[in-house]
């Protein structure tokens, strides 16, 4: 048996925001005695998870990738979203050498430029302004065949909100005097991340072979037809936008494809379908010999293709500091959030640090998580309790995915059950910590289930919120937590509790005040 230690656990309740209002609030509607007790009796505060506090534009909701990177970094990391916004604002975007080479090489051979990505103002995986800017770059550099293949959101935005970005794009292209939206399809198909290749194939076949369930004369007409079929944005079936002759636009040999998503996880599978020489996800009728395939950010170090905005090094994150100080750490989550407690929490590093262990618990194989709101929380909890009692860890980072993943479905009753499942898990975790004399910080990476309906849009609120999230200390020490913090302050706070020096690169602040 390993040495029994008194670990510090960081428990991340994904999508568990803070709102005093009971209106549309699945947390306040849930039977959650464990949560209510610690919130009433323990040192607590709320912290910011959105906007400039996490390196995003002001007012922009946070997300799991940004949240976990900020949690682990202990500083504000200017996210790719902000980085690209800044490049567009100062003009550097339009001279980015990777983008311009892709456009110029295709144009010089009379070939087409295809801009693909999530056309949305959600700002989680992409932004419509980036896609429109890319179309503008191509048209202004003289490319005559410039096409957009738009993936529709409805997950990080209201379920039926795609009309505005489609109209905005059509109006901009009309003003530019070039470019066309060539196809639309829901992100459910194009941006799968769980190896459901049958979905991705529908997006690939649409763009490469023009194989479509439906055709339309314009993108907005195609969307309206989808709504008539009762398809929300996320689930819009493959629709080719055709001219009067009925012929779809297809990606051909010598064309350039530019993928404008800046968040990697949901861009990898479709990218691999285009560029992986050993691809075996599905049978491709045709694989175009592209002049270039550009990923806007590095979707994976293993993907061998052009990258417009390569990663910037992030040194002395929490995991690295722990390793340098000879400490033992564990990262644990189910599949949906495993990358977040590992890759993102480690500042974009795939490999393990010295003294780091990882536990991956498979997520349930269901169509949507409202079918199983408890997800794999019981299995995560069983392994977490064992790690607390027997693992000999100094620090444990754990994510419970339920509130975010179920909250995205918009199902209020299922979201209440998700909260209750997490509450039951917390009861077991706290009991284990008490048995070994351990302690915990409970927080979230962003909100979701505390606001499940959008009064203004008159639709379900399936996306993240900009509300603050709780931070609670559970343990025997007599401490208080300072107000006005953010996710960037969590790593410094953990290091203070562990009596590990905070490196200069971490400019977040320790929120713990120890009683004298």
From Swiss-Prot:
Instruction: Give the residue spans that cross the bilayer.
Output: none
On the tree of life, the source organism's domain of life is Bacteria
Keyword Zinc among record annotations: no
GO CC, sorted alphabetically, is: cytosol
Biological process GO annotation list? glucose catabolic process; glycolytic process
Q: Name one GO molecular function term.
A: phosphoglycerate mutase activity
Q: Where does substrate bind?
A: 125, 155-156, 187, 193, 263-266, 337
Residues reported in the UniProt entry to bind Mn(2+) 1: 404, 408, 464
For the ligand (Mn(2+) 2), the binding residues are 14, 64, 445-446
Q: How is the cofactor bound?
A: Binds 2 manganese ions per subunit.
Q: Which cofactor does it need?
A: Mn(2+)
Active site, UniProt feature: 64 (phosphoserine intermediate)
Tagged with keyword Isomerase: yes
Metabolic or biological pathway, per its Swiss-Prot or TrEMBL entry: Carbohydrate degradation; glycolysis; pyruvate from D-glyceraldehyde 3-phosphate: step 3/5
Give the enzyme class.
isomerase
Catalysed reactions listed for this entry = (2R)-2-phosphoglycerate = (2R)-3-phosphoglycerate
Which keywords belong to this entry?
A: Glycolysis, Isomerase, Manganese, Metal-binding
Tell me its EC number(s), please: 5.4.2.12
Tell me the InterPro entries matching this sequence: Alkaline_phosphatase_core_sf, BPG-indep_PGM_N, Metalloenzyme, PGAM_B_sf, Pgm_bpd_ind
Pfam families assigned? iPGM_N (PF06415), Metalloenzyme (PF01676)
Similarity section: Belongs to the BPG-independent phosphoglycerate mutase family.
Q: What's the stated role of this polypeptide?
A: Catalyzes the interconversion of 2-phosphoglycerate and 3-phosphoglycerate.
Subunit structure, briefly? Monomer.
Quote the protein name from its UniProt record. 2,3-bisphosphoglycerate-independent phosphoglycerate mutase
**The species this protein was found in:** Saccharophagus degradans (strain 2-40 / ATCC 43961 / DSM 17024)
Lineage per the UniProt record: Bacteria, Pseudomonadati, Pseudomonadota, Gammaproteobacteria, Cellvibrionales
What is the gene called?
Answer: gpmI
């Amino acid at each position: 048996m390993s040495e029994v230690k008194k670990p510090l656990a960081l428990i991340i309740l994904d999508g568990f925001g803070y709102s005093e209002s009971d209106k549309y609030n699945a947390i306040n509607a849930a039977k959650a005695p464990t949560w209510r007790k610690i919130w009433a009796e323990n040192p607590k505060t709320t912290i910011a998870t959105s906007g400039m506090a996490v390196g995003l534009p002001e007012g922009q909701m946070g997300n799991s990738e940004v949240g976990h990177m900020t949690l682990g970094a202990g500083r504000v990391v200017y996210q790719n979203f902000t980085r690209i916004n800044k490049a567009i604002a100062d003009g550097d975007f339009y001279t980015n050498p990777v983008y311009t080479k892709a456009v110029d090489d295709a144009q010089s051979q009379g070939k087409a430029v295809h801009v693909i990505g999530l056309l949305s103002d959600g700002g989680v995986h992409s932004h419509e302004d980036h896609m429109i800017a890319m179309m503008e770059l191509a048209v202004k550099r003289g490319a005559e065949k410039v096409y957009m293949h738009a993936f529709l959101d409805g997950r990080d935005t209201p379920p039926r909100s795609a009309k505005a970005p489609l109209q905005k794009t059509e109006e901009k292209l009309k003003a530019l005097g070039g470019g066309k939206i060539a196809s639309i399809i829901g992100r459910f198909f194009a941006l799968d991340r769980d190896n459901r290749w049958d979905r991705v194939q529908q997006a690939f076949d649409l763009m490469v072979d023009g194989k479509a369930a439906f055709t339309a004369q314009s993108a907005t007409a195609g969307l309206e037809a989808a709504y008539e079929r009762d398809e929300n944005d996320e689930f819009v079936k493959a629709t080719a936008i055709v001219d009067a002759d009925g012929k779809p636009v297809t990606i051909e040999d010598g064309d350039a494809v530019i993928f404008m998503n800046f968040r990697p996880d949901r861009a990898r599978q479709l990218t691999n379908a285009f560029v992986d020489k050993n691809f075996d996800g599905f049978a491709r009728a045709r694989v175009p010999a592209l002049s270039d395939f550009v990923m806007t950010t590095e979707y994976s170090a293993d993907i061998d293709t052009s990258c417009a905005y390569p990663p910037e090094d992030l040194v002395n994150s929490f995991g690295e500091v722990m390793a340098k100080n000879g400490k033992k750490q564990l990262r644990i989550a189910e599949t949906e959030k495993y990358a977040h407690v590992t890759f993102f929490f480690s500042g974009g590093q795939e490999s393990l640090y010295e003294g780091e262990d990882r536990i991956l618990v498979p997520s349930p194989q269901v169509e949507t998580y409202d079918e199983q709101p408890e997800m794999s929380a019981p299995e995560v909890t069983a392994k977490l309790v064992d790690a607390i009692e027997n693992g000999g860890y100094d620090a444990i980072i754990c994510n419970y995915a339920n509130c975010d993943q179920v909250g995205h479905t918009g199902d209020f009753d299922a979201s209440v059950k998700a909260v209750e499942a997490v509450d039951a898990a917390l009861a077991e975790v706290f009991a284990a910590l008490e048995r070994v004399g351990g302690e915990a910080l409970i927080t979230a990476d962003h909100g979701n289930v505390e606001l499940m309906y959008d009064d203004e849009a008159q639709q379900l609120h399936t996306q993240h919120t900009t509300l603050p999230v709780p931070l609670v200390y559970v343990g025997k020490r007599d401490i208080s937590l300072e107000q006005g913090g953010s996710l960037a302050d969590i790593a410094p706070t953990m290091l203070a509790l562990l009596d590990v020096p905070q490196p200069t690169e971490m400019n977040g602040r320790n929120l713990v005040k120890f009683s004298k």
